[in-house]
Amino acid sequence: MIWYYPQQDLIIEKAAPGMTLRELNQMVIDHYAARLDELGLAKDGKTVADYYYHGVSHQLGLDTHDISCSDYEVLEPGMVITVEPGFYIEEEEIGIRIENDILITEGKAVDLSKGILKTTEDIEAWMSKRD
């Protein structure tokens, strides 16, 4: 699912003060909608909602799921949010949901998960180096 990573990176790049989680979520929906045809999934009336069951993010705080942040709350510097769009193909019993955590700053968001391996190639390369 190589198409998954660029849009996750896009959300990390676009997240900024003044935006809402709803706006970030719409970017994910738009990304997936544009790709259903190329994946052969836009058939039998299926839409993004058939493959994407939840929002892109939630605020991260003292609790894993900090409930103080609504989809309409405006992001501010100092907030930490997740970026975990998810995509599921129920009939094939597969799905992907990789979470990055980011810090909203005055400038670009800081990817707090940047050093964690997430692609198949990176994980396999790391595993092959282990004895």
Question: For the regions a protein language model found, what residue spans apply to each?
Answer:
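Active-site neighborhoods and metal-handling regions in enzymes and metal-associated proteins
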Residues: M1-D131
